[in-house]
């Protein structure tokens, strides 16, 4: 992607900011994968995010295979960004190429007043 300010983050993934993510979604059909536990995910997540808790990620890689074959960017998020970095390392180890993490996680997203979906 052509964003000058994307930086290398933990887990060997590039980081995108909360303000860059909507652009990555609209221009490259990026998929957001939230690696929080289900209860935390239900309290708030990025619109249309897929929930695969970090503990289950290795066993659920098949769910993401269709995005790898379509060469879609995968953006990993969690509350602060720490679990997303660990998830990025798992995806990179399994040869996913377009792996990004949301810098600052959902906390940074909310700080920018971007929309959050909640499930009751």
Where are these regions (language model features)?
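Short cysteine clusters
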Residues: 78
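Rhodanese-like catalytic fold shared by cysteine-dependent sulfurtransferases
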Residues: 1-30, 38-73, 82-120
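Conserved beta/loop motifs at nucleotide-recognition and modification sites
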Residues: 33
